[in-house]
Amino acid sequence: MEKILILLLVALSVAYAAPGPRGIIINLENGELCMNSAQCKSNCCQHSSALGLARCTSMASENSECSVKTLYGIYYKCPCERGLTCEGDKTIVGSITNTNFGICHDAGRSKQ
């Protein structure tokens, strides 16, 4: 009987020691601090100012402000959700200064 109890305790301790799906460095949830968009489940690491802390945030929805792309992996405005396009500044200056903002539009709907 003692051996069964010990085996059960060992099995429970192994089960609790196994890491969960939540990330520490990658696979971060929205609202968690990040240093690059590749760390976030949503693929968007956003900060509100140059000195602000960046956090994982959802991608921009239709008619929301967006960034075309970033050279640094951190956005002031997140890129659009899948199926939407960000119509805005696509110049190299906008990419370097991270001010290439636009609005998310459904490309299929705007052609009709």
UniProtKB/Swiss-Prot annotation:
Keywords: Diabetes mellitus, Digestion, Disulfide bond, Lipid degradation, Lipid metabolism, Secreted, Signal
Alphabetized PROSITE patterns for the sequence: COLIPASE_1, COLIPASE_2
Gene Ontology cellular-component terms listed: extracellular region
Record InterPro entries: CLPS_chr (IPR047576), Colipase (IPR001981), Colipase_C (IPR017914), Colipase_CS (IPR017915), Colipase_N (IPR017913)
Family matches, as CDD domains: CLPS
GO biological process: digestion; lipid catabolic process; lipid metabolic process; response to bacterium; response to food; retinoid metabolic process
Protein name according to UniProt: Colipase
Gene: CLPS
Pfam families: Colipase (PF01114), Colipase_C (PF02740)
Recorded family membership: Belongs to the colipase family.
Organism, scientific name: Homo sapiens
Localization, UniProt: Secreted
